[in-house]
């Protein structure tokens, strides 16, 4: 089993980074990721936790000796389950390969959290992958694991560059996006208040009409009761 670890900083606040994460693919640099399909989304803890399950399709060059040995293709699928926790301000993404998993198993964990040195403006990215090859020939398994670690390192560099490009575009539109969202919220609140006013006015008028109707229908009874008292 081989272990790959990686970490770096993003010069953007956690809110922006985690929002841009859903726009990470496709990008012009991480071309090995060709499709991302959402399988499931679920809100928990009164809307404070978002769980997302995705299927990621990857296409990249594979050495001929691996292709010959495994009899596979250069296309692979990865299952990813992510959890966004607004209370803890954390995004945790866990994934494992579905293709040729009986011969090579890759478990990856990625976390995004506010940077401990500058939580308001920076985000800490941490990545860990456990890579295990299965086979009777230990030397061949080691070679496969070493190649996988090298490929992870290459893809990590591409991923950082690609996500930086996405974040730059996203950041330029972030303020406008927040302003638009705020305007929509204010507009919705105003519409709701107007609806409440209209409903209250209608209810008041209806109550007044009902009161007049009751008086009109029972005027003789009220008159007799008044005369009786006098």
Swiss-Prot record:
PROSITE patterns: PRELI_MSF1. It is a peripheral membrane protein. It comes from Saccharomyces cerevisiae (strain ATCC 204508 / S288c). Keywords: Membrane, Mitochondrion, Mitochondrion inner membrane. GO terms for biological process: cardiolipin metabolic process; cristae formation; negative regulation of phosphatidylcholine biosynthetic process; phosphatidylethanolamine metabolic process; phospholipid transport. Belongs to the slowmo family. GO terms for cellular component: mitochondrial inner membrane; mitochondrial intermembrane space; mitochondrion. Residues 1-175 form the PRELI/MSF1 domain. Disruption phenotype: Defects in mitochondrial morphology. Present with 2910 molecules/cell in log phase SD medium. This is Protein UPS2, mitochondrial. Required for mitochondrial cristae morphogenesis and MGM1-processing. Controls the stability of mitochondrial phosphatidylethanolamine (PE). With UPS1, controls the level of cardiolipin in mitochondria. Cardiolipin is a unique phospholipid with four fatty acid chains and is present mainly in the mitochondrial inner membrane where it stabilizes the electron transport chain supercomplex between complexes III and IV through direct interaction of their subunits. Interacts with MDM35. One of its GO terms (molecular function) is phosphatidic acid transfer activity.
């Amino acid at each position: 089993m081989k272990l790959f670890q990686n970490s770096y900083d993003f010069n953007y606040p956690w809110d922006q980074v985690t929002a841009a994460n859903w726009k990470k693919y496709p990008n012009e640099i991480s071309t090995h990721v060709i499709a991302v399909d959402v399988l499931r989304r679920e809100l928990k803890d009164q809307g404070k936790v978002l769980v997302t399950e995705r299927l990621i399709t990857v296409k990249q060059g594979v050495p001929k000796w691996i292709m010959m040995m495994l009899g596979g293709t250069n296309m692979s699928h990865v299952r990813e389950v992510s959890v966004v926790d607004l209370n803890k301000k954390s995004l945790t993404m866990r994934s494992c390969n579905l293709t040729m998993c009986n011969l090579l198993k890759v478990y990856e964990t990625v976390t995004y959290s506010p940077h401990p040195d500058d939580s308001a403006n920076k985000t800490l990215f941490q990545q860990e992958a456990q890579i295990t090859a299965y086979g009777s020939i230990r030397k061949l398994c080691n070679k496969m694991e070493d190649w996988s670690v090298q490929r992870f390192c290459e893809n990590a560099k591409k991923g950082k560059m690609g996500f930086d490009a996405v974040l730059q575009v996203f950041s330029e539109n972030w303020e406008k996006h927040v302003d638009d969202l705020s305007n929509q919220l204010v507009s919705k609140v105003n519409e709701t208040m107007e609806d409440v006013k209209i409903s209250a006015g209608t209810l008041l008028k209806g109550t007044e009409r009902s009161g007049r109707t009751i008086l009109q229908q029972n005027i003789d009874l009220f008159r007799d009761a008044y005369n009786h008292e006098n």
